[in-house]
Regions:
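C-terminal helical cap(s) of enzyme catalytic domains, especially alpha/beta-barrels
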Residues: 139-155
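Short alpha-helical
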Residues: 23-26, 111, 137-138
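Conserved, mostly hydrophobic/aromatic
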Residues: 16, 45, 71, 106, ...
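A general structural motif
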Residues: 11-13, 37-39, 66-68, 124-128
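Active-site acidic/histidine proton-transfer and metal-coordination neighborhood
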Residues: 1-42, 51
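A structural alpha-helix within SAM-dependent methyltransferase catalytic domains
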Residues: 3-6, 10, 29-32, 36, ...
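Gly/Pro-rich active-site loop or hairpin
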Residues: 50-125, 140-144
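Active-site beta-loop-alpha junctions enriched in small/polar residues
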Residues: 14, 19-23, 45-49, 73-78, ...
């Protein structure tokens, strides 16, 4: 199905972007390479990488450089490692309970923003950097703070 989807996107000179999440960037790259197309591409979410797999977002940028068409500005921390199949409800394990990660305001988590943004610049990424804030008591305030945080890298 993804092979057909990638070819359809190619025929439209478009991309279907899949968001990073339960897999490492190496696993995702292997899958995307198997399609032989960039019709199925990547929305790189650095927080999902650090929260779920513990993957380094800057290394993911270099690894997925040929496929990145969009990226999020989101931050988080991994509290403990939990199999991604358990995180996303594919498998159950009654012995593994509790939240294994937490989304936090931009700049307060484990994403190394200087390295991540430098990597995006190194590969020539010129697309959007969309602020995503899914939780928190005051998302509007968090988004405003995120704008200010990112401006510090763009001055």
């Amino acid at each position: 199905a993804c092979f057909e989807l990638s070819r359809f996107a190619d025929s439209l000179d478009a991309h279907f972007a899949i968001e990073t999440g339960p897999e490492t960037s190496a696993t995702l790259k292997k899958f995307l390479d198997s399609l032989g197309s960039t019709g199925v591409a990547v929305n790189l979410d650095p927080a999902n990488l650090v929260m779920v797999t513990g993957d380094d977002p800057a290394k993911a940028v270099y690894n997925l450089r040929d496929y990145i068409v969009h990226t999020h500005a989101k931050d988080g921390v991994q509290i403990f490692y939990k199999d991604p199949e358990i995180v996303y409800g594919i498998k159950k394990d009654p012995l593994v309970t509790g939240d294994s990660f937490e989304e936090v305001p931009l700049g307060e988590g484990s994403v190394k923003w200087d390295e991540y943004l430098a990597a995006l610049n190194d590969i020539g990424y010129k697309g959007f950097l969309t602020i995503e804030r899914e939780v928190g008591d005051d998302p509007e305030k968090d988004i405003g703070n995120a704008v200010n945080f990112l401006k510090g890298y763009m001055d």
